[in-house]
């Protein structure tokens, strides 16, 4: 078993933000949220998050993860000082500690598992994750022997010309045998330019220490500013989209499409350009989504087409057409074989099967039965200035163009609403309702001067 500590105390001044750096969003999760997400596959014995700047905000953002234990680093005096804060919490612990940075969001769970496995199999005092990168300028170098045993960690400015040819860098991820680390932590010194306590000094004080290379150096990319945040987002998106294409999903122009990690796509889904899929979204087989569509926290059935549409927190049934320029939101449910056409908005609406609202309509707080046809320009007037009211429309009912249904109101089954009507009272089954003034034509009309 292993205990995990995530360092999340830094301010991140280069982000130029009041938001703590580790809480900046990246494709559906915060930076630290991604780190903790990958940790779950390790099934750690305990999980510590070391907080400092914006600690209350970090606690609040992670409040849905009750397994986390928060430890405060009141003064941010370096990575070694951060890990020192664990000493009172792990007095009798004899196992291993995995130390991660909360601003390195792209690490994979299997990479961490491999690091722990190597560490335990070799009975190391410490095992560090390293990477071979094409341009290591500015990074500290990790010098090892032929068996990957650590000889030295050297800052870039202190490297000789020969040492600068070494492209192996420290990723800042460590697995320690805790009793050995705990013995050296109290003796760390801050005699450096930053007057901080470095965890690398603890590594240099331990033996044996082994280095393990990560297979893909992009995994260890950190985020210190908005440019690096954007770069990390591109790596994450490429990873997600490649996996979906290999799973049988067609992406037309992948560079213009974004898909969050929490989205689920069935085989034979087609995603058109400029489409964005977010949150807990699921899309059924054979559906064609886009171009120009945003879907968030919604369930889309099989063989749905949605073009130039915004769909949030809703459900769309099979063989339904949505768009162009439709907006479906707030727990709307659309059954199978429906059509939601151009410039139609649904809000908290439930539509039965084979129901059509083809153009220029607003249906809010409304329940529609099967085979309903909503004429162009029909709206439900659901708000009286104080509260929202429901509209109920029975199966087989048809509304004429430019109708207004003033809620609360109920239309029965097979009702026909004449075009231009303003309906303010309930209508029984099989009725025709005409709620408009009779047209008056006055020939040869000459207005008074």
UniProtKB/Swiss-Prot annotation:
Gene: glmU
One Pfam assignment: NTP_transf_3
MF (Gene Ontology): glucosamine-1-phosphate N-acetyltransferase activity; magnesium ion binding; structural constituent of carboxysome shell; UDP-N-acetylglucosamine diphosphorylase activity
Binding site for acetyl-CoA: 376, 382-383, 419, 436
Cofactors, names only: Mg(2+)
Domain of life: Bacteria
Amino acids binding UDP-N-acetyl-alpha-D-glucosamine: 7-10, 21, 73, 78-79, 140, 155, 170, 224, 329, 347, 362, 373
Residue numbers annotated as active site: 359 (proton acceptor)
Role, per record: Catalyzes the last two sequential reactions in the de novo biosynthetic pathway for UDP-N-acetylglucosamine (UDP-GlcNAc). The C-terminal domain catalyzes the transfer of acetyl group from acetyl coenzyme A to glucosamine-1-phosphate (GlcN-1-P) to produce N-acetylglucosamine-1-phosphate (GlcNAc-1-P), which is converted into UDP-GlcNAc by the transfer of uridine 5-monophosphate (from uridine 5-triphosphate), a reaction catalyzed by the N-terminal domain.
Subcellular location field: Cytoplasm
Similarity annotation: In the N-terminal section; belongs to the N-acetylglucosamine-1-phosphate uridyltransferase family.
Keywords: Acyltransferase, Cell shape, Cell wall biogenesis/degradation, Cytoplasm, Magnesium, Metal-binding, Multifunctional enzyme, Nucleotidyltransferase, Peptidoglycan synthesis, Repeat, Transferase
Residue span of region Pyrophosphorylase: 1-226
Chain residues that bind Mg(2+): 103, 224
One Gene Ontology CC term in the entry: cytoplasm
HAMAP family assigned: GlmU (MF_01631)
Name used for this protein in its record: Bifunctional protein GlmU
Database matches in PANTHER family: BIFUNCTIONAL PROTEIN GLMU (PTHR43584:SF3), NUCLEOTIDYL TRANSFERASE (PTHR43584)
Subunit structure, as described in the record: Homotrimer.
Biological pathway: Nucleotide-sugar biosynthesis; UDP-N-acetyl-alpha-D-glucosamine biosynthesis; N-acetyl-alpha-D-glucosamine 1-phosphate from alpha-D-glucosamine 6-phosphate (route II): step 2/2; Nucleotide-sugar biosynthesis; UDP-N-acetyl-alpha-D-glucosamine biosynthesis; UDP-N-acetyl-alpha-D-glucosamine from N-acetyl-alpha-D-glucosamine 1-phosphate: step 1/1; Bacterial outer membrane biogenesis; LPS lipid A biosynthesis
Cofactor binding, note field: Binds 1 Mg(2+) ion per subunit.
